[in-house]
Each structure stands twice: as C-alpha cells, then as structure tokens.
C-alpha cells in the first residue's frame, strides 16, 4: 500500500499500488528508420523468388504428399500471404477430389492443412490407422514425422472429433519418448512442438523458429524458398521496427512513465501483441492503431486494478460513458491525463479513417471501450468491498474485462476491407469471439492467480470456482484448463466453411487466442513480467535480423 495526494484533495489517500517493474527496453526502439537502399535491394530480389515459388505451387503431376509438404513449408516459412489464392484453390481441389492415401504422415498433414483452411474433412481419414479396438496401431510409433503431423493435427479438433483426443494422447506419449534420441533438426522440431503446437502459436514467432532452427538445417531444404523467406522476414522486420519507432515516440510524448508511474510501461510488449494479430504489410495502419489501443487500455486497467479509489473510479467510469471532454473537470489530476489522451486518440482515429470515408466506424470501438470500463468498475467494487461472486456472475463480468471484445473490434478499424456488416456481426459476440475471450480469461486467471491472491484479491476466477464447487486450487485450475480446451474446439468449428464473414476477419480472432497461449505459457504472466517469456520473442522479431 502507498499514500499519495491526488489533484486538489488535501487528505491523504491510501492506494493499493502495485510494484510493476520498469520497461526492459528504454529508448531502444525510438529512433529506427528504414534503410531504403537495403529495403529496395531485398524487394527486388524477392520478385523473381516469388515467381519461382508460384511456379512450384502451380506445377502439375506432383504426388499429393509433395504438394502438401510444399504448402506446409511455404506457410511455416511465413511467405504464404503472397499465395493465398493459389493455396486455397489447390486445397479446394484436394478436398473436393476426396484425395486420399494410405500414408500415415501424409494423411495427418492433409487433415491439418484442410481444417486450418476451413475445409471440414472427416476425421475418419485416421480410422485406417487404428486396430480392431479403435486404438492407433503401435507400429506407427516408429514413424516420428507421422507422429509429429498427427500431434499437430490433433490441435485443430472440434467437438465431433473424438478420434483426435486419442490422437493427441497417442502422439504425445510417443513423441516424448522419441525426442531425446532424434537427430537434429527433427529433435528440435519435436521438442518445440511439444511445448508449443503450431496451431496455437503466434505465426511470426513460429516462422522465425522454423527458418533459423529447423529449415536451414534440413538436408532436403529448397534454397529458393529459404532465401525468399529470409529476405521477406528481414524486409517485414524493417517495417515492423519503423512502426514500433513511431509508436514509441507517441508513447514517449504522452510521458505516462512520469505522470502515471503506477502503471505498467509495456508499449513494446503491446506492439508484440498487435504483431501477433497481423504481421502482413497491408495491415500496417491497423497494427499501429491496435497497439496504441492496447497501450491505452493497459493504463486504464492499472488505474482500476492498482491505484484508483472507489469515488475516483466511479467518476472516471461515468466520464468514459459520457465521452465528453467537458467531463474532465470532475476528475482528479492524474485521471485527467489518461482521459484526455483516450479522447484525443479516438479523434485521431476518426481523422485517419476520414480519407476512406470510414470515420463513422470508430463508434464501434468506443462503445466497446465504454463496456470494458463499466465492467472494470464492477470488478474494482468487488475488490474493495471484499465480495466474492458465484463463478457464473464472476465470468459474466470478467469476460468483458479481458478487453478481447474491445480489441477484436479495434483490430477491424484499420482494415480496408472491413464493412459495417462485419462490425454488426462482431457486436453480437459470435461463438468464435466468445471462445477467444474465454481462452484469454481462463489462461490469464490461472497465470495470475498467486499474484492476485497475494494482493488480497479474493474475487478471482480460481477462488470463485474453488468456493462454488468445493474443490482444491489444483482442481479449479484443471477445470479452467478444460474450459480453454472446449473454447479451442469452438474456435476450430468457427473456422469451418461456410463462414459468416471472411477468413481474414476470423483469423484475427484466432490470433488473439494464440497470443494469450504464448504470453501466459507455463502459467507465467509474460505481459507483466516479460523477461522470461516475451523478451526472447521480441528480440527475435524486432531486434535481430536473420543472417542471409
């Protein structure tokens, strides 16, 4: 606890100030500018490599296994965004031809790729690899690549895919047993997959790992694809670093580190979050808008969680609902700073989008922010009053405070293809969005439980679950893990065709769930304490380029 005088208040106010660590990055990203000569050189070299890759994709007379492996390699190398139409047409043909084979490894890869692209291929493709008791044949245990593909395929399962529950257990136990005895780079690939499956990984993180740690070391690598991937990664990294420099200057100008020292200084980690939602160059404007939004809502979150008093937070909540700069005089000085910054930010968004005659869509994000703040206030009231709600009441409020309804809506703002219908669909909290939100909530709650408990927070998801069901901490955490697994099945179902909106928009919701899985891996809070979890990823994506 700490005492502080706020605004014109003469009395001392006791505040539950959290002791957050400072930024790991200082001014490291502040002054980057693209070397246009190098960027131009990379771009020119990419063009013929791109056409050679397209020719590989469109070549005819190839075996099914070779086609699937080529697509998988292109996707893992992070260059598939150039060939979305071609890849979709090839997979559509494979799906409609009911292309089938008796090869274990190829069947598993076919299943995963088709499911990830929205084709509802039947899990019965695996029945031929089972014995008379419906168990996977033990003879498959010697096919490590097949096991790896089966393991990766098991993570795209839906509620109807019971066979894939067995596939996950079977592949996991045999891969864990085989891993120590494998040669490089297969050993590294298996070890990495067991810690972070491909489907739930952040695409850029997985790409960097695959290029540097796996594909470069493979004897059968295609040097055209490898060079293309390296050049493209480095070229995109220049754009990403330029965006981060722009955002870092914006953040430094706001000077929240000085004026709001109680809050987490995590603008670089916020950029990583936005980069996880979309990395492609066409989303540059959307990415910058999203990272600013995440940074701002993080300040608001810490204001409610770690600083504000009941009276102040009620006034702040009311001011946000009214969304009027004239409300600012009702607030203590420190709240005026963030309130003005929020309103200014959304005015900037409206200006940015006015050239495309889309400034009117900003209202969707504003309404979502009002919703989040209202729920933050409920949460802070529970904390201050020492109220522990039933788990159902807790979740109805806590799902909104993940900010994921809000961030999903904001992530659409800068997308040129977003229509009013897309925002309307999103506003109804479709099942796939609800699932992404649930994943965020239960994984966050599990990772932050001990810290929140030590701060005297009793209305945590785990505590509410323990009390409602009369179970231990371990069992409550297992129950939350089961909720996350169920939600992943909902996401996977939501990606299957026909879909109510384009795959482009569904992928953003999928990526939001992926970021949570990565940020809170091993029950660590990688956002609040980025040293162990996010720092290595940030260095790989935004500091170190790939040696060409």
From Swiss-Prot:
Keywords: Cytoplasm, Lyase, Magnesium, Metal-binding, Plant defense. Expressed in roots, but not in shoots. Pfam families: Terpene_synth (PF01397), Terpene_synth_C (PF03936). Mg(2+) 2 binds at residues 301, 305. Gene3D superfamilies: Farnesyl Diphosphate Synthase, Terpene synthase, N-terminal domain. Its cofactor is Mg(2+). Mg(2+) 1 binds at residues 301, 305. It catalyses: (2E,6E)-farnesyl diphosphate = (+)-5-epi-aristolochene + diphosphate. The Asp-Asp-Xaa-Xaa-Asp/Glu (DDXXD/E) motif is important for the catalytic activity, presumably through binding to Mg(2+). Belongs to the terpene synthase family. Monomer. This is 5-epi-aristolochene synthase 1. It comes from Nicotiana attenuata (Coyote tobacco). The lineage of its organism: Eukaryota, Viridiplantae, Streptophyta, Embryophyta, Tracheophyta.
